[in-house]
Amino acid sequence: MSLMLEPNPTQIKEERIYAEMGLTDEEFAMVEKILGRLPNYTETGLFSVMWSEHCSYKNSKPVLRKFPTTGERVLQGPGEGAGIVDIGDNQAVVFKMESHNHPSAIEPYQGAATGVGGIIRDVFSMGARPVALLNSLRFGELQSPRVKYLFEEVVAGIAGYGNCIGIPTVGGEVQFDPCYEGNPLVNAMCVGLINHEDIKKGQAHGAGNTVMYVGASTGRDGIHGATFASEELSESSEAKRPAVQVGDPFMEKLLIEACLELIQSDALVGIQDMGAAGLTSSSAEMASKAGMGIEMYLDDVPQRETGMTPYEMMLSESQERMLIVVKKGREQEIVDLFEKYDLAAVTMGKVTEDKMLRLFHKGEKVAEVPADALAEEAPIYHKPSKEAAYFAEFQAMKMETPKVENYKETLFALLQQPTIASKEWVYDQYDYQVRTSTVVTPGSDAAVVRVRGTEKGLAMTTDCNSRYIYLDPEMGGKIAVAEAARNIVCSGGEPLAITDCLNFGNPEKPEIFWQIEKSVDGMSEACRTLQTPVIGGNVSMYNERSGEAVYPTPTVGMVGLVHDLKHVTTQEFKQAGDLVYVIGETKAEFGGSELQKMIHGKIFGQSPSIDLDVELKRQKQVLEAIQAGLVQSAHDVAEGGLAVAISESAIGAKGLGATVKLDGEATAALFAESQSRFVITVKRENKEAFEKVVEAIQVGEVTSTNEVTIHNEENEVLLTANVDEMRKAWKGAIPCLLK
């Protein structure tokens, strides 16, 4: 039996075995003090996963406290499986985003698939039916064979899981930069709907109540996954494939239906997903949140491998498992319910009053630790922070407009940059129409899903321009939230709240910690100004390979409320003769832009700037015009500037083009990436009414010529481009790079 091989408490201390599990000398001394004795092997394992950055946020908590987390509509902020926001009529939207970066770097298909599975469980553990999935992906340059492999496998993994489980993947974003070559980012978001009375918490109340294990059996996959996610990737990480879990979407589909039926039963007290740190986190957190303890008999854990030790069972991150607490005496009802779905439901313990997590195996007590010590009392570190050396240098640079010889060729080249190019190759692999509630499919500013039985819809998006955040973390943090809100507004939605996924390098490096602090400062300010509180999220640190960190990438997932589906607006032009308006001024801002990266092969200088009060004013005006029925199409101006935004609106339409006139220096007018700008089209008869509501400049009109023609203020033609040719270049870019 492998039990014989476990080191004893003295060996764990003297041979510093705890260090291999991720605990520091000081942390091990704290554990010894909490217990009043040396921990055994299982107990050391419990502390090592629960005190990892991934589970405890020990390095990021002081920064996360800056986020605004309350608001009129917020029913549940950070701290539970997912956040919840009221949408009226006794309904609420539940959503959360999480990362699965490290597993996806090692085993991309399963890493991405189980990332999707985990975030779905977070949402239905709150009592909500999952209705949509989104993702935000980062990879190196597609010229590299390894990157092509990671990209193809990650997309296949997301598709494989989401399509089988029957939840539409409706939106997302993909960006490519060399810094992600060895460390891709895979962030998955799930959105669910719930009635107020069905909201459930992951809390173990009521001494004597029964603790039950439901779902798939436990294997050795994913042991120490949380610890693995709290260290840098290296050559030896390849050997950690066992730390990557394997998902079964068909099992999860059954689990969703069983749990949603269970939630209607008054026998249920609390429910939580076994996510990172598996049984350890679910039991310790449920006990701690309720101010109770839990006693568990590990012989009763359904196991799919023989001879598993308590340590292995507690730390396994096998997928498709939930821990539930039910009223004493009602266990058989639960067993019967799960049996109907061919799922196991096993009694394995009870709730106690003494606040201890106590584990038994083969008649012996194998662990006894305070639940609060695991769930709440991890040390909190105030890491040293130091402004990155490059920042002052970039801020002092005198920025020059990139030299462009041929505007048309430059536009075509930009449309073929993988970050701008059509992502159809990606989303064509996703079933985005399953459940038949998708109103706006992938490819527009935000996806929209109808709320059945009402006239309402939910708009949703993921956004983050990591280049801006690298150049100026605080300004970039503001832009990430503002762009997400702009996308929601362009779709006809009122921004409600955000979930975030903070992807950074090693927080022990002062310059990385400075990036974390500053970007959170920027995001927090934007959330306050735009009234979109943070209702939950995830931190992913140590995204480095060979000491090189990824760009700071605090991804924003935002959900908005479309009050009436009549207001749903998309980015493509609708009919010839409509007037084209631009909202917002264009400045020669090229730092971190697609044009700068394309011409110079790198990014430098100052990021675009943003005034949040101006942003809010413009968003409110655009939303008011949309809700008044005055807007035909709306598109946010982002990567590639106005020329790309206008071209995208033409590409999305059939047989339409536009003739527009842009003032100012030509390269900036066409390609600068100034913030808070929109391209809007309006019916001619609504011109006056629209101009009363929105401060905008009419720049041209939609034509039936199938060409985009852009003039300068002297009326000289800067470029004329055939829309079919642009569409072909834009759609063909990613498939061509993958050949």
Curated annotation (Swiss-Prot):
Q: Where does substrate bind?
A: S99, H100, N101, H102, R121, Q245, E317, S318, Q319, S540
Q: In which pathway does it act?
A: Purine metabolism; IMP biosynthesis via de novo pathway; 5-amino-1-(5-phospho-D-ribosyl)imidazole from N(2)-formyl-N(1)-(5-phospho-D-ribosyl)glycinamide: step 1/2
Q: Which Pfam families match?
A: AIRS, AIRS_C, FGAR-AT_linker
Determine if Ligase is one of this entry's keywords: yes
Name the active site residues.
Answer: H54, H100 (proton acceptor)
Subcellular location(s) per record: Cytoplasm
Checking CDD domains in the record gives:
PurL_repeat1, PurL_repeat2
One term under GO cellular component: cytoplasm
What keywords does the record list, in alphabetical order?
Answer: ATP-binding, Cytoplasm, Ligase, Magnesium, Metal-binding, Nucleotide-binding, Purine biosynthesis
Write out the residues that bind Mg(2+) 1: E98, N538
**Catalytic activity of the protein:** N(2)-formyl-N(1)-(5-phospho-beta-D-ribosyl)glycinamide + L-glutamine + ATP + H2O = 2-formamido-N(1)-(5-O-phospho-beta-D-ribosyl)acetamidine + L-glutamate + ADP + phosphate + H(+)
Chief subcellular location equals: cytoplasm
- Source organism superkingdom: Bacteria
The residues that hold ATP are Y57, K96, D500, G537
Binding-site list for Mg(2+) 2: D122, D273
HAMAP family the UniProt entry points to = PurL_2
Q: Tell me, how does this one assemble?
A: Monomer. Part of the FGAM synthase complex composed of 1 PurL, 1 PurQ and 2 PurS subunits.
> What NCBIfam families does the annotation carry?
FGAM_synth_II (TIGR01736), PRK01213.1 (NF002290)
Reported function:
Part of the phosphoribosylformylglycinamidine synthase complex involved in the purines biosynthetic pathway. Catalyzes the ATP-dependent conversion of formylglycinamide ribonucleotide (FGAR) and glutamine to yield formylglycinamidine ribonucleotide (FGAM) and glutamate. The FGAM synthase complex is composed of three subunits. PurQ produces an ammonia molecule by converting glutamine to glutamate. PurL transfers the ammonia molecule to FGAR to form FGAM in an ATP-dependent manner.
**What's the protein here called?**
Phosphoribosylformylglycinamidine synthase subunit PurL
Q: Which organism is it from?
A: Bacillus cereus (strain ATCC 14579 / DSM 31 / CCUG 7414 / JCM 2152 / NBRC 15305 / NCIMB 9373 / NCTC 2599 / NRRL B-3711)
